[in-house]
Amino acid sequence: MKKNFHLVIGNPIAIAHGEVGDDAWGHTQFPAAFHTVNGKILVSWEWCDDTIEYKGNVHSAVSCDGGNSWGEPAAEDRISYPKMSNGKCFAGFFKKGAHPVSYFDQYIPAYTSEACGKRYFAKEIREKQDTTVYGIEADPVTGETELFECKINWPYMPIGVTASGMVYPSTMVFCLSQRCGLLMSGEKMYFSLYFHGFNSDAASRKEALLPYMDKYCVYIFESCDCGRTGNYLSQIPTNEEVIQSNPNAEGFCEPMMARLPDGSISILLRTGSNDPSFIARSTDDCRTWTKPKVFDSNGVLPQILTLKNGITLASYGRPILKVRATSDPSGMEWDAPIILPLTESTDPKENEKPWGKKQQSCFYTGLLPLSDHTALLTYSDFHYPNSDGIQVKSIMARKITVVFDE
């Protein structure tokens, strides 16, 4: 049953500021929010060039007052990760950036394109250093971490080599799921990821090429042992509707899932930098999905979160920042989006910056529940003034509160 409600959006709160004049793409961007083991909030963000090599420079800040003020994290301010069957915590998948290789030259690719390079079936590659997926387990007391090898059951699992000869390791493909597609549900963990992959539902190798091989495809996995084993469940390949709207679209990618009040699972999907976002629904725990339909006219890394009061929130953007909500238990009917204004640049040379056009944010957001009725939204604002009044790239937060109408 739908409920009448409205959202109260709090004022912007600055978490951290970048350096004056640092306009490099990837610096002071891509915030994510977490709870810590000691009851605080931790927000992390990237400070490195946004490349497939992934140099991995992550900064963070913590709040002990619900997001009102922020400071440097201490050693004990560790992220609260899900427990594994061995008593350790699952801290995600190991990040290993793309790197040059030559050993793939001895293999015949299953697919080659100028746009996306070469695709191979991972099981046919004898060398395992780039096809192996590694998880990270953390000691719940000390926080010390170590790697473990994941057993991945994925029909026609892909591995790709770019046109410049860089292999994109399988463990990095799975690493993407912890930022945009990890869902805990009881004793099970579902993770969704995306890649220029194959048709994992194909009856044979010869039938494993998808209609749009140069577009991303979303794949969903289930783990009953908190990440040690990943079993393929389903896929959401790019469809004709996406191609018709924009032949240059990236395809379905950056998936984010949430369990809805009626027990179903909704998934939000990006299709491009300034292209529509889509939504699909599963009523059988990710084994099948409804045909994706347009969610909004934009949406990179769309976030979705169901609060304990039954209201589901979404945040997304590019070229504008939006928040949306629904009381529909199935998550299929949403209220109109709310546009959140960002700081306008006062720099007359804004259009000459590295990204080539005026842009106010990376528009990658994070959503974290604070209570039954409140969530924390994190985002970047490229022109927010620092303590000296100088506009710099900044990591920001705003509280979203659900108020039920009488």
Language-model region placement:
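Asp-box/BNR beta-propeller blade signature and adjacent active/binding-site loops
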Residues: 1-406
